[in-house]
Amino acid sequence: MRLKIKNLLYQNYLILLAIILVGLFLRTYQLRERFLYSHDQDLAGWFIKDVVIDKHLRLVGQETSTQGIFIGPFFYYLQIPFYLFSHMDPIGGTYLVTFLGILTMVSIYFVFSQIFDKKVGLIGAFIYAVSFYTVNNDREVVPTMPVILWSVWFLYGLNLLLKNEQKKAFLVFGILGGLIWHINFALILALVLIPVTLYLSGKKLEYKNLTSGLIAIFITSLPLLLFEVRHGFQQTKAVFYSLTTPQSDTVFTGYEKFQRVWYLMSKNIHGLFMGTFPWLSFESVSIIFLAILIFLIVKKIIDRRLLFLVVIWILIYIFFFSSYSKIVSEYYLNGVTIIWILTFSVFIWQLLKRSDIKHFGVMILSFFFVFNLNKFFSYDINASGYVQRKDIVSEIKRNSNDRGYPCVSVSYITDPGYNLGYRYFFWLLNVKTAPIGNDVPVYTIVFPLKPIFVTDVNKGAIGLIYPNHESYAKERIEKGCSGENSNLTDPLFGFTR
């Protein structure tokens, strides 16, 4: 009997290892070419430079799209060892998110196995490893990337609470609660489930069990507390203002806003599972998943208390963002992605358990695998990311060095916002810049390429126009370059020094 159990465990771990290797390949294949480098990643580089080079410990990360609210610094600090490993190159950030992606696969396997069965854990890890949606999520070097990792451990905490393991549960909640500010403010919505779960557990709260959780949330929230005290509770006021004052969404109101949220949630579910499967709309897929949830409820396959929590979890997100005044993006709803993975995993597990319908489960997983791989390999690679931006700045450095220019000026022919995401490379490659108008050679970056703009060098979708070298006198260039490096002194949108 023991030998049989050991063989099963060994088999499960081999399957998990294979899943991890597939997931690792999908997250590292063409790592540089598929690195979506833009302003957010540029800001991360400046944060890390500020800490590592300038020895300035920071309490906040970049400013969010809501004025006065900053993301926490934890994700940025996590990138530091990877930046050091890559000699301060931003590619180091991709190593971190790859590691976090693998950690999420293992976490899903562990948590699903604890709540249900190891087969459910393997199915969940497989879905996360292969899904085009989660693969892309794990390639984005942004603080919101670990949302699904946070969610799976929050689910674990809820399960602990249902089993009356309050001390462990509140330790988990304490750590996760403090990390919300560092990852995504929308995760705070899930905290409503804690008192609901406590009620469903049928056991009263033992206050002594809160101690470890309170200590954990204090430690993880310490940067926020220090920042708020130093800055007159700036973020607290900004959060209150954002929740009580209409902001930027004048396009969708009332029922239209609800439709918008439902559409985005349906789009996320479709992206999570369907790959290039052509015959189902976004809304059709969401209806199928609701039908699966109802099936699991009717058949009593999942603990009714856990199912109740799952439904409440979904409804909280739908109703909150249907009434939220700000324009809602898809990633705001990533906090419920783990629910869709869980639902699908349990459903497939039920199919695989029965020999008469097992082939349907195998067929669905096979289609899932094929259509998601097809989308991954047929996806058009962004031609204005890490490789192209670094190459453009490298070309400016090469050409200016060949001409003996002590510094350069840089202009942009592009839409507002697309001129961002280059400055860290100018620092990394040691290119000194000066303001335009200082009689300094002006290099012009063009995006996107258009026939009316004749470029000298193209890197992907980004072009470069050289200065008219003959029109710049050496003495005037030296005088124009005698000041400070404007790349280091000019304000940087979203970054506070």
Model feature map: region roles:
Residues 95-115, 153-157, 292-299:
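Transmembrane-helix motifs of polytopic, lipid-linked glycan transferases
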Residues 33, 45-54, 64-65, 161, ...:
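Transmembrane-lumen/periplasm boundary regions of multi-pass, lipid-linked membrane glycan transferases
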Residues 17-20, 215, 348-375, 385:
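Signature aromatic-anchored transmembrane alpha helix within multi-pass, membrane-resident enzymes
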Residues 361, 366-481, 486:
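Catalytic lumenal/periplasmic loop and adjoining terminal transmembrane helix
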